[in-house]
């Protein structure tokens, strides 16, 4: 909220023209004051299904000439992972440099973790595959500061990022939750260098090996017109970055805020920003999933959504499976797509990276997906159906586990 009131005060004093500006211009100005890096002249392609992501990514990997860098929370050892690594093996034999980082915690608690014999065979074929912060007993020492990235950079020309790990449930769903929905994107342009820097930093943290940035950063030109800001959460360095930028965007919204997030247990600062937006008359629409991949998180999310509903927010429950997307649209003017959930783990502990995209066409595409899902798969939460959707057992669970939601 302090960012909103600072802008308001400057307007009242006549020292700023923010009052005549739309929210995207105000947010860009505040981001620049805060030092968040901007990249202009990009092209963005949204990839709203697992099939679209993997078809596009695999084609790009097959055409790689120089290097392939991948940094993922987890690679699930299943059919889609085998298909990807088979392509990467072929590229490594052609002389393409292949470097892969995966998170130890994400792998260990995967349904189908990468096993040592398989990893050894992959490494023997010429790929560098490294495990970030190996989990050892006692595991509790490694629960914080996990690598939650989902990034691929190919030849310094193309980057992929968003909510999808590498697993076939993005194509086939899961028995307990049904279809697994998510949002990824493909980026051309200067922003690719930002993702390459994120990879190089994680590579160093994992291997203590410094990569020569001049070797991997692109100086090429892109004819795109999309302006993007990179927001990276690095523990002990930029720990407040994701929640700060979310709050700046929400605090300066003028008309409508639309959010899809799978684990919206919410930290206090974001919840307060949303409540103040509602008081200003801003329309707030949030899409939450009826099911989830954890036993109690949906109950805690339900408590938060109930509170916001009572404050005037429109809460839509997605019944078409599990919506794992991490996106927000503001005023139809700008949006964010990234890896961060709206929970304490993403906002206070893990390594995360989000892109804020200042492009009305990209934002409109996300809004179209949002409205389509509302029409086809969602039910509006009301005081009447709240008790039906959340019977006493779930309400008690939500209240009890809300007290420790910072650890969920």
Name what the model sees in each region:
Residues 17-408:
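Charged, low-complexity intrinsically disordered terminal segments
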Residues 4-13:
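Sec-dependent N-terminal signal peptides
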């Amino acid at each position: 909220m302090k960012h909103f009131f600072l802008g308001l005060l400057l307007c009242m004093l006549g020292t700023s023209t923010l009052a005549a500006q739309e929210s995207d211009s105000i947010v860009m100005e505040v981001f620049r004051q805060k030092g968040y890096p901007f990249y202009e002249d990009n092209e963005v392609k949204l990839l709203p299904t697992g099939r679209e992501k993997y078809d596009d990514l695999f084609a790009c990997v097959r055409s790689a000439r120089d290097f392939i860098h991948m940094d993922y929370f987890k690679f699930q050892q299943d059919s889609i992972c085998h298909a990807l690594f088979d392509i990467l093996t072929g590229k490594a034999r052609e002389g393409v440099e292949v470097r892969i980082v995966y998170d130890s915690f994400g792998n260990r608690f995967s349904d189908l973790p990468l096993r040592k014999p398989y990893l050894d065979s992959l490494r023997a074929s010429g790929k560098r595959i490294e495990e970030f912060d190996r989990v050892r007993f006692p595991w509790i020492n490694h629960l914080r500061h996990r690598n939650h990235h989902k990034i691929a950079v190919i030849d310094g020309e193309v980057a992929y990022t968003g909510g999808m790990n590498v697993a076939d449930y993005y194509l086939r769903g899961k028995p307990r939750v049904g279809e697994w929905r998510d949002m990824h994107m493909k980026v051309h342009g200067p922003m690719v260098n930002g993702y390459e820097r994120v990879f190089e930093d994680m590579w160093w943290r994992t291997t203590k090996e410094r990569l020569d940035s001049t070797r991997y950063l692109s100086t090429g030109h892109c004819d795109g017109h999309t302006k993007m800001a990179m927001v990276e959460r690095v523990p002990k360095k930029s720990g407040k970055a994701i929640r700060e930028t979310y709050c700046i965007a929400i605090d300066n919204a003028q008309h409508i805020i639309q959010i899809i997030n799978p684990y919206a247990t919410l930290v206090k600062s974001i919840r307060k920003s949303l409540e103040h937006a509602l008081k200003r008359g801003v329309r707030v629409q949030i899409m939450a999933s009826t099911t989830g991949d954890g036993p109690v998180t949906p109950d805690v999310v339900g408590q938060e959504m109930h509170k916001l509903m009572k404050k005037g927010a429109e809460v839509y429950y997605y019944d078409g499976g599990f919506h794992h997307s991490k996106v927000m649209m503001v005023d139809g003017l700008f949006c964010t797509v990234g890896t961060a959930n709206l929970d304490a783990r993403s906002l206070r502990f893990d390594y995360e990276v989000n892109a804020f995209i200042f492009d009305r066409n990209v934002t409109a595409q996300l809004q179209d997906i949002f409205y389509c899902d509302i029409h086809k798969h969602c039910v509006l939460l009301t005081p009447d159906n709240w008790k039906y959707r959340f019977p006493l057992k779930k309400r008690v669970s939500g209240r009890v586990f809300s007290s420790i939601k910072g650890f969920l």
